[in-house]
Amino acid sequence: LSSHYEKLDGIERCIDDEIPFEIPDNWIWCRLNMIGITQTGNTPSKTHSEYMGDEIPFITPGDIQDGHITYNNQALSTQGKTVARVCSDGSILQVCIGGSIGKSAITDREICFNQQINVISPIIVCSEYIYAIMQSPYFITSMKEQAGGTATPIINRGLWGSLLIPVSPLSEQYRIVEKQRELFDKITLI
């Protein structure tokens, strides 16, 4: 077996003790924050009524259910958008605090989101593939371990972004996503 290394700030270090399982030779282990832009949401001050409106959906953990997002519960004005965190369609939202930790969904539009949600906007990888990894027992368990055993588990963006994920070649990502769709379609017929 070959060893696994990462190079950060010009320093190479062995990460064998972090590798949870073997992956095919043409796959790589990668930190979540290396495959896209990560951010944590925020809530514009409600004392500024001009921030509220109907221009852009404002998402909270309660709006994420079973991999879907309810977009019409709250919204911000154009001015509110300027003080909020914004992500584009194809970004993956994941609740990172409390009993809902790990709930996630892919947005199909530009949105703003609150501080209980971390987002990754994938670059050069398939969003649906990364979403599938983030829903896996491996990833959810890793999140909860990093969140600690407090009464209210929480994982900050730095720890969340440092979680390792297995990344396959892009063509394989699309094949995996398509196969997963086929299987889920068959399951819904049962």
Task: Describe the predicted segments one by one.
Residues Q39, Q94, Q115-Q116, I140, ...:
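Glutamine-centric residue-chemistry signal
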Residues E12-E18, N33-H48, G62-D89:
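Sequence-specific dsDNA recognition surfaces
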Residues I111-N118, E128, G149-V167:
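A short glycine-rich beta-alpha junction/loop motif
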Residues R13-N42, P166-E178, E182-I190:
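Non-catalytic DNA-recognition/assembly elements of restriction-modification systems
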Residues L1-I11:
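Extended, domain-scale alpha-helical bundle/helix-rich regions
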Residues T43-T47, I64-A75, D89-F113, E128-A132, ...:
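Short, ligand-facing micro-motifs at secondary-structure edges
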